[in-house]
Amino acid sequence: MRYRTLGKDLTVSALGLGCMGMTGVYGEAADRSAMIKLIHDAFDRGVTFFDTAEAYGPFTNEELVGEALAPIRDKVVIATKFGFDINLKTGERSGGVNSRPEHIRAVAEAALTRLKTDRIDLFYQHRVDPAVPIEGVAGVIMDLVW
């Protein structure tokens, strides 16, 4: 496997595993234990970059990825996203986008719990919210990083 550096020091496998389809975003959810095995098999073959999002499920994909990667957390890079207007308690979708700073912070906190981790390695905007200036989005991300 080849590896690349993102930014200053985030080393990832050249091939990443997008986990969206594992929890039924399109069609039926795959067998949970089979998907955990697939994630482990990918890691065993050198994949260290795993992508998920709150919107997948919603929430169930982050939970699956968190469970699968918990035993090897310090050896992998996890990416997740924000930007949809999803009720963080019920999972109900409004059909819109939401990148208000307070929502981004809440999504990050909830993702940490679902992913069973103390950090999100790559956290990015899934959909642009035209109601929120990009400077506001960048500012809250910078606050979360520091």
Where is each model-derived feature located?
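Small/flexible residues
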Residues: 4-6, 83, 102, 129
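Feature marks short, surface-exposed loop/turn motifs that line or immediately flank catalytic pockets
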Residues: 21-24, 56, 84-88, 126-129
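Low-complexity, flexible helical/coil segments
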Residues: 49-55, 85-88, 113-117
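N-terminal binding-site loop/beta-alpha segment at the start of enzyme catalytic domains
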Residues: 1-80, 146
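Structural motif corresponding to the early beta-alpha repeats
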Residues: 71-99
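Glycine/proline-rich, positively charged
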Residues: 89-146
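A periodicity- and composition-biased signal for non-globular, repetitive helical segments
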Residues: 8-10, 87, 133
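A short alpha-helix capping/helix-coil boundary motif
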Residues: 16-19, 45, 87-90, 119-122
